[in-house]
Amino acid sequence: MSKNLLIELGLEELPAYVVTPSEKQLGERLATFLTENRLSFEDIQTFSTPRRLAVRVSGLADQQTDLTEDFKGPAKKIALDADGNFSKAAQGFVRGKGLTTDAIEFREVKGEEYVYVTKHEAGKPAKEVLLGVTEVLSAMTFPVSMHWANNSFEYIRPVHTLTVLLNDEALELDFLDIHSGCVSRGHRFLGTETTITSADSYEADLRSQCVIVDAKERQEMIVEQIKTLEVEQGVQVDIDENLLNEVLNLVEFPTAFMGSFEAKYLDIPEEVLVTSMKNHQRYFVVRDQAGHLMPNFVSVRNGNDQAIENVIKGNEKVLVARLEDGEFFWREDQKLQIADLVAKLTNVTFHEKIGSLAEHMDRTRVIAASLAKEANLSAEEVTAVDRAAQIYKFDLLTGMVGEFDELQGIMGEKYALLAGEDAAVATAIREHYLPDAAGGALPETKVGAVLALADKLDTLLSFFSVGLIPSGSNDPYALRRATQGIVRILDHFGWRIPMDKLVDSLYDLSFDSLTYTNKADVMNFIRARVDKMMGKAAPKDIREAILASSTFVVPEMLAVAEALVKASHTENYKPAVESLSRAFNLAEKADASVQVDPSLFENEQENTLFAAIQGLTLAGSAAQQLEQVFALSPVINDFFDNTMVMAEDQALKNNRLAILSDLVSKAKTIAAFNQLNTK
């Protein structure tokens, strides 16, 4: 007869960003534990609040399934001695399995007999197996952990309760310094300690203590309450998904309310207001029906609506203090001169091993000038890039960015416009930070894109040059994100700038502040980012073939990946790739100094293939270029069918290998086709 299992771990408040991943991890780890221990179940449901992680297993078998395993031992000739008795090898084998030689039987495997034993293990009761669930809790991993009291162990937060129920029976377990039972804790202010009467009553028992344990239900409550406020007040509320996910993990019993602030603060840039409300106070932004910011906000209380007016006033007071700071910095920063701020950047450290921000900007300016030419920017755009590169970090020394660092670049754009800088320059100051997250927005202007590329390239090369190279998951300076940004920007703008030649040219530059080193590591790092970009849709063999090509032009590589993926589903893909692979493999034996001599051709097939290679222009899109190369497949096959490439005559052999080398030289600009898998 199946039962339902409940496990709840009660803790001090968890960081909001940890709650949802930890809830998921607990469910996955418990499912693995049950499967590995042969306890079948029907369903697993997880729960979480800032103060608890829980999981309920429905339809849990009351006993493990029986286990029958066959074990293969030594060969019969080793298992028996000269007298036909079991040898020490055979005896040791069965003893290791907890059996005796009586269990031995011989089975033939590929013409030879081997010792086999069959071990039967009766399933244990579920209650006995579940004593091991503390292993699941101990195995949980978190971004940070802590010690508390005088304990030697550490965990994400101090543990207060452990509830383990099999239907309505409490199981006796010990985890860290806690003994399990059926007691849980209600809402910190509105509830008390409470008894969970059964696994099935979990939600109801805690609801009576003002705790909504289902995160999805809390989210729905918050959204519904906000929608009600929208209707009542005739406004629109920006329900930012990331903020919503954070807020629902800050509360156990949500109550949304609307507060207000003086309209005079609307004169502050909208980004400052939104940052103050959303990022610092976890408030939802309120707009009118036309989308204009209103002097209101929506917040979510961890509790009911008792004394809600006092709560509203308290939140308003806290926000106004933030807005006062924003208003002050907005006013005072406008008194500053960009040139003065730029001059002070010589005293701001970019990194202690690399130098100052001013030196970083100087290198970026040189790189940006080179990129502007490669990207064929207009004279006006080149001028804008150069000016932007001279000043683009100045806002880091403003009071506003000092207080609200999320606004770096954004305030730079605004202050630059107020100071009379060209709009293209101001926009580039903001856009050079983009993309600021995986999948984040890209620069929209060429000037901003070039500055972003230059800034990211110097950052990458500088950190690698002083040995600060990411390893494993450790990437404290976000170099993977910066490099991914480089790849995405190049692809977005379609700039066919060969990365290998570009990086070579950067390593030829000379700076007093820094000498670039570790070029090979940089190139491998960039290749890994391109590989990741292709990996979204392309299998490993296609990615490896493209990365082994003779071209390192990001937009072309990504386009070839897409074209090869599509082509791999067509009928002619396999024969075309196989003929090209054969050519690639033979071409490796060619003498690079040998040029094709048509006078040495002995058959029409040599003439035909050579002419086809000479006429191969590889023009058009990646798909069209691939089609042109694949179209050579019959000609290549005809050549192989009628020509002995590895002829005894050395001149003929070298000439035929040179033909194939010419073919590979052109085809390899698309991909190394012999890396592709056709099985």
Swiss-Prot record:
NCBIfam families: glyS
Catalyses which reaction(s): tRNA(Gly) + glycine + ATP = glycyl-tRNA(Gly) + AMP + diphosphate
Keywords: Aminoacyl-tRNA synthetase, ATP-binding, Cytoplasm, Ligase, Nucleotide-binding, Protein biosynthesis
SUPFAM superfamilies tied to this protein: HD-domain/PDEase-like (SSF109604)
Highest taxon above the source species: Bacteria
Compartments, record wording: Cytoplasm
Cellular component per GO, a single term: cytosol
InterPro entries for the chain: DALR_anticod-bd, Gly-tRNA-synth_bsu, Gly-tRNA-synth_heterodimer
EC category: ligase
Name of this chain's protein: Glycine--tRNA ligase beta subunit
GO biological process, one term: glycyl-tRNA aminoacylation
The protein's assembly and partners: Tetramer of two alpha and two beta subunits.
MF (Gene Ontology): arginine-tRNA ligase activity; ATP binding; glycine-tRNA ligase activity
Enzyme Commission designation: 6.1.1.14
Similarity remark: Belongs to the class-II aminoacyl-tRNA synthetase family.
